[in-house]
């Protein structure tokens, strides 16, 4: 708490002196080694806890259900509480020496028990305005919105935020937009999640009729609002009779597809993401990404080179 108060006071003085404006705030993370070896890790079964991300989706799901009723006249029963009661469990590597550390395994990074330092840096002079720490197996996107909201509310009003592709998740575009924050993020490359020839890009979106048209010219109509651990999705589905007689069926459906009809899923926040990414070739967008690279990556580089961050060992959050 003492170090936190010192940090906040330094940031306050930087704001008073005009060194921090909130015009562009970049975010990134770097790994910090835990004071534990890989030999101390063991595979254990853990219960998946309902995280903050899941809690955030509650309000948006209710909003989406009301919109679904307006658009289709249908309303499915909300299943959020049911999903929260599910005792879903998974296996993860946990260190006996430091159980709070997380097993990090990322391309180009050292593998083993680590922590992640998540930092937000003001783009004027590279002043760090916010920081949080998580276990090394936590995705960068998990603490991001809480960190940005805390800075925006308690430190300095943020005009625009910038981040790399790890932070390009649909909910961020919606939440930051509602806060009045422009979001300049490097687009995340998305791979097709279907094992057939036709992907979602092969389906034409007809905004006026609120349908998707398949390569065979048949309509996929809005059926429901689906929810998973990764977010909220509109589900559009074709008529089974159309798919049964379609000459392109083998390119669109797997042989073992039990539905017998093609489905297309679209993020509930897709419009917010698209609105931001439409500006990705503008000078303002490109300049913000450059500032993030210079100040965020440069700040971590300086901390590792001059302040021993590359060699320090941590134990416990």
Named regions from a protein language model:
Residues 1-317:
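Anion-binding and metal-coordination hotspots
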